[in-house]
Amino acid sequence: MRVLVQRVKEASVKSGDYYGSVQKGLLLLVGVHELSTESDADALADKIVKSRIFEDDAGKMNLSVQDIAGEILSISQFTLYADVKKGNRPSFTKAMQPQKAEQIYHYFNTQLKNKGLKVVQGCFGEMMDIALINEGPVTIMYESKDGKLV
């Protein structure tokens, strides 16, 4: 399972009539591998929530999203598992099938919410318009396999 994390001043998602937004916090692009499990979601949720990627008063990255009472916009993103080795069209065969991936995606978001964070979700499997203002920028890729960070 992969999660691309971006530190944001604000971010929003729109899909049809649906609109969701967050203020200062994180934008998460969440990719679920064909072998991902709830253990991977647990490991990533725990690490991301505790990661000190926000600046303290001295300008050092010393604060987590929990420390700043930040918000999270979580977007499903199967294209994080694109294979571009052959041809010109990416293959997405390493991404989990949508029905199972959606379950793990929602489970991951529930784990974030259980840690006391405001979590806004995108629309799984739908075309979305994502807007954000990066802060930094700070962009970090997190990955878990077999319930452990890699």
From Swiss-Prot:
UniProt family annotation: Belongs to the DTD family.
> In terms of domain of life, where is this protein from?
Bacteria
Q: What does this protein do?
A: An aminoacyl-tRNA editing enzyme that deacylates mischarged D-aminoacyl-tRNAs. Also deacylates mischarged glycyl-tRNA(Ala), protecting cells against glycine mischarging by AlaRS. Acts via tRNA-based rather than protein-based catalysis; rejects L-amino acids rather than detecting D-amino acids in the active site. By recycling D-aminoacyl-tRNA to D-amino acids and free tRNA molecules, this enzyme counteracts the toxicity associated with the formation of D-aminoacyl-tRNA entities in vivo and helps enforce protein L-homochirality.
Q: Which Pfam families match?
A: Tyr_Deacylase
> Carries keyword Nucleotidyltransferase?
no
Q: Extract the SUPFAM superfamilies matched here.
A: DTD-like
Q: Which InterPro entries match?
A: Daa-tRNA_deacyls_DTD, DTD-like_sf
Domains (record comment): A Gly-cisPro motif from one monomer fits into the active site of the other monomer to allow specific chiral rejection of L-amino acids.
- Answer whether the UniProt record assigns the keyword Metal-binding to this protein: no
Q: Which GO terms describe its biological process?
A: D-amino acid catabolic process
- Keyword terms of this UniProt record: Cytoplasm, Hydrolase, RNA-binding, tRNA-binding
**Motif Gly-cisPro motif, important for rejection of L-amino acids at which residues?**
136-137
**From which residue to which does any coiled coil extend?**
none
- What is this protein's record name? D-aminoacyl-tRNA deacylase
Gene Ontology cellular-component annotations? cytoplasm
How is this protein organized at the quaternary level?
Homodimer.
Q: Where in the cell is it found?
A: Cytoplasm
Please list the reactions this protein catalyses. Answer: glycyl-tRNA(Ala) + H2O = tRNA(Ala) + glycine + H(+); a D-aminoacyl-tRNA + H2O = a tRNA + a D-alpha-amino acid + H(+)
Which GO MF terms does the UniProt record name?
D-tyrosyl-tRNA(Tyr) deacylase activity; Gly-tRNA(Ala) deacylase activity; Ser(Gly)-tRNA(Ala) hydrolase activity; tRNA binding
**EC number annotated for this UniProt entry:** 3.1.1.96
